[in-house]
Amino acid sequence: MALTDGGWCLPKRFGAAAADAGDSGPFPAREPSSPLSPISSSSSSCSRGGDRGPCGASNCRTPQLDAEAVAGPPGRSLLLSPYASHPFAAAHGAAAPGVAGPGSALSTWEDLLLFTDLDQAATASKLLWSSRGAKLSPFAAEQPEEMYQTLAALSSQGPAAYDGAPGGFVHSAAAAAAAAAAASSPVYVPTTRVGSMLSGLPYLQGAGSGPSNHAGGAGAHPGWSQASADSPPYGGGGAAGGGAAGPGGAGSATAHASARFPYSPSPPMANGAARDPGGYVAAGGTGAGSVSGGGGSLAAMGGREHQYSSLSAARPLNGTYHHHHHHHPTYSPYMAAPLTPAWPAGPFETPVLHSLQGRAGAPLPVPRGPSTDLLEDLSESRECVNCGSIQTPLWRRDGTGHYLCNACGLYSKMNGLSRPLIKPQKRVPSSRRLGLSCANCHTTTTTLWRRNAEGEPVCNACGLYMKLHGVPRPLAMKKEGIQTRKRKPKNINKSKACSGNSSGSVPMTPTSSSSNSDDCTKNTSPSTQATTSGVGASVMSAVGENANPENSDLKYSGQDGLYIGVSLSSPAEVTSSVRQDSWCALALA
């Protein structure tokens, strides 16, 4: 494989005697002039897809580099304390220089493959840890910050800073390749869930078999997400192992996911191409590097490019990222129909949104309720079973449950019979009946038609005269017009007379007739009559006490409001007036 002038592919093998065992830091001593600078391009690769030369796969080492790797500079010892206690490292790895732990007594150790390509030196480098025999190393309790000192440049490119976070982890070579997605990708997929849902994600379909291809009996980690090609603006390149032939290159190995952001980024774009606002192409690894037990390199990661567009449609959703929990392998999705037709179906999509989007153009159903039932009843075409009416202010039911209009239902309820369908003809006014004439005076105009003893129709005047006098009405009394009485309103004058007596002094003379007194007494209320009787009695007692004829003015205060004062001319007039009034008979008795 031809490398660029500025690029290099230099694996370092550190033996047990390569460095001093007393080094305590992860990188205790660094050579300032050494070309092993961790700064490398995120999209660097030792091998492109298909360009597998003598340096591809496991042939990337040269004899000169092997000699240098065997010797090893004394100041480059590594302290891999997080991996010293790995059970698989104890079984397959040798004692690392400066490592105290179960794996310190072994004969061989891991290879550190450093890849860089200086054609894209602006992006940050990533370290790819490849384990020749160790598989699926667990999460490190604490990752040294010096390994990721160059990732500080990534913090300015994405929403989250991944540099120097304690609790970050790098598995082994395959795990690093799995976590080597872009650090600032807008959508995050949990690494603990990727393995179980690779079959559902179209842009990660090819990587589903990757972690399971490791030989050596470690078992595939369900949460490995496979590396893919990356673009420089998103600060990460797809990582392939030593000699991996992924389409995006393999030099961007160790994307550091901190404990604050335990999600591996979604597949980014390939080979630094400009991102399309509508979407980007993700090159997912198909092989994911089947690591052999004796070899120390990853197999070729084939590039299957899956294009999914309109990712920007998911970005304005208030920055919400769809997370899949580790405990549920497949759970009912809460996102529905694809935001755009080109969006591939995934496990986080639900039929609920499909149904909502499908009914976007359809009118919303009217909620059911009493008012809805009433509207439905009114909208239905009902018909009265009796008269056939379809409109009525109130629908009623008969005993059998059939609908009746308000008139028929009420008639049936009141009379117990069905309402007759034939309406009776309106009665013609008696004064306008054709062919009718009085059998006595032969008039055709009257206010009321009567019948005589023989049953013949007579006018109101002839019928009333016959009823009162028992003889037919004489024709001489016939008049052309109908004479009506001009009736005055009842109780108007009489009420005025009674009120006048109560408001002022009224001279009571003997000429007053008893009929007027009777009428006034009849028209007044019983309380007024009782009051009047009391007044008469008090007046008589006053007259009996005062025998003086000159004292004709009597004033009393017992009945206020009825008579203020009564002026009498003489006792004789009073006596005669009282005797003539019938209402005073009880008082005199």
From Swiss-Prot:
The keyword Calcium does not apply. Residues 17-47 have a biased composition (Low complexity). Transcriptional activator that regulates SEMA3C and PLXNA2. May regulate genes that protect epithelial cells from bacterial infection. Involved in gene regulation specifically in the gastric epithelium. Involved in bone morphogenetic protein (BMP)-mediated cardiac-specific gene expression. Binds to BMP response element (BMPRE) DNA sequences within cardiac activating regions. It comes from Mus musculus. Keywords: Activator, DNA-binding, Isopeptide bond, Metal-binding, Nucleus, Phosphoprotein, Repeat, Transcription, Transcription regulation, Ubl conjugation, Zinc, Zinc-finger. Residues 234-251 have a biased composition (Gly residues). One of its GO terms (cellular component) is nucleoplasm. The modification Phosphoserine is found at residue 266. GO terms for molecular function: chromatin binding; DNA binding; DNA-binding transcription factor activity; DNA-binding transcription factor activity, RNA polymerase II-specific; NFAT protein binding; protein kinase binding; RNA polymerase II cis-regulatory region sequence-specific DNA binding; RNA polymerase II-specific DNA-binding transcription factor binding. Residues 494-534 have a biased composition (Polar residues). A zinc finger (GATA-type) spans 384-408, 438-462. This is Transcription factor GATA-6. The GATA-type zinc fingers mediate interaction with LMCD1. It is found in: Nucleus. Its main location: nucleus.
